[in-house]
Amino acid sequence: MKQFAFPKYERLLKRSEFVQFTNARQRIHTAHFILLWTHTEDSTLKIGITVSRKVGNSVIRNRVKRLVREFYRLNKSRFVMAHYNIIAKKGAEQLDFQRLSRELANVLERLHK
């Protein structure tokens, strides 16, 4: 069961950690998400989730973040060791978990090509 955990050391929490993505050239766009990633020298896997107010009110934004966290938790082994920031675009609030999972799984497949 611990393999499906999402401990604090796997999260991007500080502003300075998110700022490293400002000039990230490594990005993939989909209809509802933007995935930014940077390889780091410490070879750790960390993820940050960004949902702006354009997506909806706080209840909706938190739901989108919960769904993305759940996708990460269940598919952690498919991520390469790097730091990721998943940004939700307007319209992501309309996705259910299956459609969100399909879209993010396609992103990971494109990432590994």
UniProtKB/Swiss-Prot annotation:
Pfam families, per database record: Ribonuclease_P
SUPFAM superfamilies: Ribosomal protein S5 domain 2-like
Record-level GO cellular component terms: ribonuclease P complex
GO molecular function: 3'-tRNA processing endoribonuclease activity; ribonuclease P activity; tRNA binding
UniProtKB keywords: Endonuclease, Hydrolase, Nuclease, RNA-binding, tRNA processing
GO biological process: tRNA 5'-leader removal
EC number(s) reported in the record: 3.1.26.5
Signal peptide coordinates: none
Reaction(s) this enzyme catalyzes, per UniProt: Endonucleolytic cleavage of RNA, removing 5'-extranucleotides from tRNA precursor
Protein origin, superkingdom: Bacteria
InterPro entries named among the record's database cross-references: Ribosomal_Su5_D2-typ_SF, Ribsml_uS5_D2-typ_fold_subgr, RNase_P
Function per UniProt: RNaseP catalyzes the removal of the 5'-leader sequence from pre-tRNA to produce the mature 5'-terminus. It can also cleave other RNA substrates such as 4.5S RNA. The protein component plays an auxiliary but essential role in vivo by binding to the 5'-leader sequence and broadening the substrate specificity of the ribozyme.
Family to which the UniProt record says this protein belongs: Belongs to the RnpA family.
Subunit-level organization: Consists of a catalytic RNA component (M1 or rnpB) and a protein subunit.
Protein name: Ribonuclease P protein component
Protein source organism: Geotalea uraniireducens (strain Rf4) (Geobacter uraniireducens)
Gene expressing this chain: rnpA
